[in-house]
Amino acid sequence: MFEQPIEISSNQNINASVIWMHGLGADGNDFVPVVEMLDLPHIRFILPHAPYRNVTRNNGYEMRAWYDIYGLTPISREDATGINESQLAIEALIAQEIKRGVPANRIVLAGFSQGGAIALHTALRYPQVLAGVLALSTYLPLNSLLAAQKSTANQQTPIFMAHGVDDAIITMETCKASLAILQAQSYRVDWHEYPMAHSVCMEEIADIQQFLNAVLGDLAVE
């Protein structure tokens, strides 16, 4: 069961939305400080909570997770059912934003780690054009299915992909393998590397702000 997400908006004249998924074991509160630092009042930020589930890799411990993780590497064996369930939940949030008056092409899907995997998975299959994707410290899940399942609507959607050179949770090798797949299928990937581990840094936040301003620039709604 997916709970009510956190919403952050400081302006009545919202004309864009970012749906931002947290990483394994966290919740929607995890990126509230980052959203506040971005200072983008024309954007509504939606921060959903993943459901609790038993995570095989963590000895079956129950925690918030967008899908189960079975092996030592995220792509050793994948929980397609869990990934697809989370995709449907995020698509429902997109539909909600559209109903509230924000068109799909003014919506960005964002996420960190597991959340970034869901952002990529969902965006590349979504049937309407989205404004962009923020894929932070993550990888492309179910990558062997992308060619058959992708939507041409988001073939040219800008993807901001960032990774820490010292990341030991999702290695740079894993991330760059995903980058290569995206580039081979002609996706528009804006690649960034930072001197950090499995986290975010101030330089990255500044680059995220620049990206969001580029794809969701304020339309000055009165």
Kindly give the residue locations of the regions a language model identified.
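A short beta-to-alpha transition loop/helix N-cap that caps and shapes the active-site region
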Residues: R53-N58, L140-L145, I169
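Short beta-strand/loop motif that positions the catalytic acidic residue
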Residues: F160-H163, D167
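C-terminal catalytic histidine-bearing segment of alpha/beta-hydrolase fold enzymes
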Residues: E173-E222
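Alpha/beta-hydrolase-fold catalytic nucleophile elbow
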Residues: H49, A110, L136-S137, A162, ...
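Serine-hydrolase catalytic machinery in alpha/beta-hydrolase-like enzymes
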Residues: F2-V108
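Primarily recognizes the serine-hydrolase "nucleophile elbow" in alpha/beta-hydrolase
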Residues: I98, N105-N154
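Short, proline-enriched alpha-helix->beta-strand connector loops that line the catalytic pocket
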Residues: N154-I159, Q185-Y187
